[in-house]
Amino acid sequence: MRTLLALAALAGFAAARVPAYAITRPVMRSDSRADAVKEAFSHAWDGYYNYAFPHDELHPISNGYGDSRNHWGASAVDALSTAIMMRNATIVNQILDHIAAVDYSKTNAMVSLFETTIRYLAGMISGYDLLKGPAAGLVDDSRVDVLLEQSQNLAEVLKFAFDTPSGVPYNMINITSGGNDGATTNGLAVTGTLVLEWTRLSDLTGNDEYARLSQRAEDYLLHPEPAQYEPFPGLIGSAVNIADGKLANGHISWNGGADSYYEYLIKMYVYDPERFGLYRDRWVAAAESSINHLASHPSTRPDVTFLATYNEEHQLGLTSQHLTCFDGGSFLLGGTLLDRQDFVDFGLDLVAGCHETYNSTLTGIGPEQFSWDPNGVPDSQKELFERAGFYINSGQYILRPEVIESFYYAWRVTGDGTYREWVWNAFTNINKYCRTATGFAGLENVNAANGGGRIDNQESFMFAEVLKYSFLTFAPEDDWQVQKGSGNTFVYNTEAHPFKVYTPQ
């Protein structure tokens, strides 16, 4: 059931918010809501396994299947870490059987280095870390080593992507021919969202090549050139030249295409503060610049906070995305880790802004893209803009996790049960509007009755992210739960796969 907050009440909440560090630590216990999320996961898995396995994703309306991720069973690999956390040994064993049989050297599709890294490589590495660590004994230990073996096999297949004059990789590659799509640039997020996975693989295998490849590419982003494409400290352009590693533009945002570069800067410091102090420094610079230069408040709702974009003409763009709503969680993680209350407070403001995009629609689910530019409000959305401070550019919902993700971080950092309720409301609405007889479908328009029709696709990140963060919010305390301060023993990749933080041998 959707919770409706009056605008005055929301403003009052923002004004009277208790400082994060004054709130008691979350009390962890078994919760029937965790069981409800487990049921949703099993429902989605059963539909996928019965109608689409071993293909990449289920079409949950027609009960067909898709192979958008190399034909290697993306949903199965992406589901592994969540199934482990839920301690569902049956599903974990089904996935281990599948992974052992995959030949990562064979596909007829062009392969995305980025998507393959964050879903397949990360899913297997995370499964290994969990089953060799806090979930040891869930399945026969002799079955676990294949995860690391297959991770290394996959990395060996993919690593030629880095064979460029600069070391900045191609993203779209042909693993059969050893070719690529001929691109001259790579995206900021694509280039900057490989280092956690490839470094972890090196640390587990003792082969430092994987870390060197990813960190060489990242180094161009940590020392960006030319200076004009870093208009504010830490905030850099959204594309990188493959030939020389120089930035190709000065388009600044936390939106898709740039987002997870910033996400990984602070997460690399969580992973190993000894090696990745520069990553922390660059994240701090970006965070401070974002507060000073990108923070934006709709004219009709000055209590709401979003992050704007910035272009080469020195203009702010008042458009954001569901993808961008990870930003609150990033500020919260960095703020609690570095004992920066200003980052925590700003993160909570961003979380509240993204909550508004959920709380204000007919379905209680947020849109793919939204804006708060007062000069572009469609006549049909003037009431929404006046009431909520945003209007919708793209009303689709394709089972994205970022809003729930940031709610989860807010709960873990503050201990304030409000954020648990926000997670529950979001999960309940997804379960209501997206659930089909065999899984979960996307929505055409979150601000139309019944979601404006359904999209016949169940993305693998429904398993990896939406259901994981929903479950973790209500699950008992465990090693993999996000912690306040510097107490994290796991750090999550951008697909919500937890890696064990580095500990020197």
UniProtKB/Swiss-Prot annotation:
Signal peptide: 1-16
Example GO molecular function: calcium ion binding
Glycosylation sites: 88, 174, 359
Catalytic activity from the UniProt record: N(4)-(alpha-D-Man-(1->2)-alpha-D-Man-(1->2)-alpha-D-Man-(1->3)-[alpha-D-Man-(1->2)-alpha-D-Man-(1->3)-[alpha-D-Man-(1->2)-alpha-D-Man-(1->6)]-alpha-D-Man-(1->6)]-beta-D-Man-(1->4)-beta-D-GlcNAc-(1->4)-beta-D-GlcNAc)-L-asparaginyl-[protein] (N-glucan mannose isomer 9A1,2,3B1,2,3) + 4 H2O = N(4)-(alpha-D-Man-(1->3)-[alpha-D-Man-(1->3)-[alpha-D-Man-(1->6)]-alpha-D-Man-(1->6)]-beta-D-Man-(1->4)-beta-D-GlcNAc-(1->4)-beta-D-GlcNAc)-L-asparaginyl-[protein] (N-glucan mannose isomer 5A1,2) + 4 beta-D-mannose; N(4)-(alpha-D-Man-(1->2)-alpha-D-Man-(1->2)-alpha-D-Man-(1->3)-[alpha-D-Man-(1->3)-[alpha-D-Man-(1->2)-alpha-D-Man-(1->6)]-alpha-D-Man-(1->6)]-beta-D-Man-(1->4)-beta-D-GlcNAc-(1->4)-beta-D-GlcNAc)-L-asparaginyl-[protein] (N-glucan mannose isomer 8A1,2,3B1,3) + 3 H2O = N(4)-(alpha-D-Man-(1->3)-[alpha-D-Man-(1->3)-[alpha-D-Man-(1->6)]-alpha-D-Man-(1->6)]-beta-D-Man-(1->4)-beta-D-GlcNAc-(1->4)-beta-D-GlcNAc)-L-asparaginyl-[protein] (N-glucan mannose isomer 5A1,2) + 3 beta-D-mannose
Binding residues annotated for Ca(2+), in chain numbering: 494
Record pathway: Protein modification; protein glycosylation
Localization annotation: Cytoplasmic vesicle lumen
Major localization listed first in the record, in broad terms: cytoplasm
Cofactor: Ca(2+); Mg(2+)
Alphabetical list of Pfam families matching this protein: Glyco_hydro_47
Keyword terms: Carbohydrate metabolism, Cytoplasmic vesicle, Disulfide bond, Glycoprotein, Glycosidase, Hydrolase, Metal-binding, Signal
Co-factor note (free text): Ca(2+). Can also use Mg(2+), but with lower efficiency.
Listed GO CC annotations: cytoplasmic vesicle lumen; endoplasmic reticulum; membrane
Active site: 368 (proton donor)
Similarity remark: Belongs to the glycosyl hydrolase 47 family.
Protein name as it appears in the record: Mannosyl-oligosaccharide alpha-1,2-mannosidase 1B
Organism per entry: Emericella nidulans (strain FGSC A4 / ATCC 38163 / CBS 112.46 / NRRL 194 / M139)
Gene: mns1B
